[in-house]
Amino acid sequence: MSVDLPVAQRRSFRGPALVVACVLVMSVCLTWAFFAMRAVMNVGGSCADGGPYVSAQPCPGGAGLIAIAIPVMIVTAMVGSAAAISVGAPNLLIPMWGFLFGSLGWNFLESAVTGPDIVWGWLVCGVVFELMALPAILAILAGVKTAVLPPDRPAPGTGSRWWVPAYALLGAVGFLFGAWSFAALS
């Protein structure tokens, strides 16, 4: 004797698998954007390759990956957020926003203060980028607090508590793969 579950109670692995894939792709793209920007900042902040004119500063290896990384990351965050909603996981747009602007702001700040003189333009950009990242980082911290210390005891198997460490682990794996692949492609 078998009992069929209603369609609404059947669990599919497609939604969670899509969220996992999106977190990994987002992490790789974030890493590529971080290192590509850093490479360009190391040659003065601007470069060019190809075209009818000869550039005074050719682009370093891997600099072009930023043109792929940011659009792919944005689309992946949107698709991943839609999938995350369907499985009760946190959205990916807020972490993407916070980590993108936070990491690029870090590059500006570090480049502004590591030379012989302070580069005020980069310092201002770094502060602005960090201020743009701040609301998302605060939202992430509030979400982590709620996931770790929920106000009410959640029912077993509901909510997104287990996604918090999963996102952190997947982000770390994506970062490592992104760093390795950036070095290989540069």
Language-model features and meaning:
Residues 42-62:
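Perimembrane loop-to-helix junctions flanking transmembrane segments
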Residues 4-17, 76-98, 132-165:
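Cytoplasmic membrane-interface segments at the C-terminal ends of transmembrane helices
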Residues 58-77, 107, 120-135, 166:
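Alpha-helical transmembrane segments of polytopic membrane proteins
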